[in-house]
Amino acid sequence: MASQREENSTQMQNEVVELAYSLARCKLENLLNKSMRIRMTDGRTLVGLFLCTDRDCNVILGSAQEFLKSTDSLSQGEPRVLGLAMIPGHHVVSIEVETESLQTTTHGL
């Protein structure tokens, strides 16, 4: 009887993990092709469209632009066009999704 309870407990834990994984996946899928701003450990900021991520939290941005950290707090200077960029997960400090990008939805026919 105790082994039955342990088995049920393990099964419930597995279901909770699967549900959490499914919810996280849905949130990530909703962010696909949305404009993101990623701040990195070296002070650079990359802005581009979120294309994908992996289990190591690396992020791929499309149409990416790089902004260097400026010593002058009023200007960031001209962006450098990167195109497709891979940001290693361990270099990510923060990720912001542009609200305009979240409000815009595309409807397929």
UniProtKB/Swiss-Prot annotation:
MF term (GO), any: RNA binding
Stretches that traverse the bilayer: none
The entry's keywords: Cytoplasm, Nucleus
Subcellular compartments: Cytoplasm; Nucleus
Keyword Chaperone part of the UniProt annotation: no
Domain of life of the organism encoding this protein: Eukaryota
Annotated family: Belongs to the snRNP Sm proteins family.
Summary of the function given for this chain in its UniProt record: Auxillary component of the N-terminal acetyltransferase C (NatC) complex which catalyzes acetylation of N-terminal methionine residues. N-terminal acetylation protects proteins from ubiquitination and degradation by the N-end rule pathway.
Protein name according to UniProt: N-alpha-acetyltransferase 38, NatC auxiliary subunit
Gene giving rise to this polypeptide: naa38
